[in-house]
Amino acid sequence: KTPGKFNSSHVALDDFTASISLKAFRQDTLNAAVRRLSFKERSGFDLKRFAFQVVANNKSLSIKDFMLELPNSTLTLEGPSLKYDSLQSIPSFTDDLTCQGNLMGSVCPKDLSAFLPPLEGIDDPMSVNLRYEGKGAEMSIPEIRLYNRKYMRFMANAAIRHWQGDGQEMQLEADLSRMHIPAEGLSYLSDKLKGIIPDIVGKLGHVDLKGNVRGSDTKLKVGGLLRTASGDLEADVTMDTDKNGRRSYSGNLSGVALDLGTLTSNKEKFGHADFNVELKGFNYQGKYPESNIKGVVSSIEYSDYQYKNVTLDGIYKDGGFNGKV
């Protein structure tokens, strides 16, 4: 019913192989191993090999020899372990429960296209390194690294609290140290993900992004600086979610030397622009964005004329601006 896409309601496996060993299974001891698990799913997902060994007692649990292999991907998990006062304490996520580990390897996006079909055309693998540690209801990822020479350099860290649903709001902190996509990589991704990535993204040239995220599942603050060959954008935005799940955005957006002519494919009309505006209540109503806008366009080039210090105070709605200029 969904060719080429995984459907959890209609799972069909071929070439299924499993080799499992159970050396010890007692009230306070577990020693088991999945020596090999492999199959092909009709969506196209191909699990070449999944293997690990788990050893546990009343104080700790460790996983050894973890290996996940897909046609063009390999992931290993080093040193994943849990420590606790007793097996009975695990479900409560108290501070007695700690964990740590390191995920590394190489992932080819195409191998995951059964779950995300747009990845079908991206057959260049990227290296992955993810280090994590946790205590109770707090999980931190001090290091996240993704790298492919052609299209991606990504470095970040993150922490999450109260993720297990203990009645408190989930808290998230994340810092993006750097995401760099060279011009060649941006062209490659825009071509492979045509129809998914907006056309304007392919016109940016190269991309360098730094930013951070702070907040909860109802109020999230996002800040970032985007540097491109077509100008720079800096944003400081707060996302609010009401009890009905509706989202609205408010904050500041500024642009420096933004090449509107290139971005709009209309160099005869537009040149560069510098601006600093405040958005309040930004959201989508139908197909158009809607927001209160207040700020200053320091400079904008239009039809071979440069306009300076243009003030804006009004509302953008239904594809048009209504207010004072």
Language model features by range: what are they?
Residues 1-16, 23-325:
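Interface amphipathic segments
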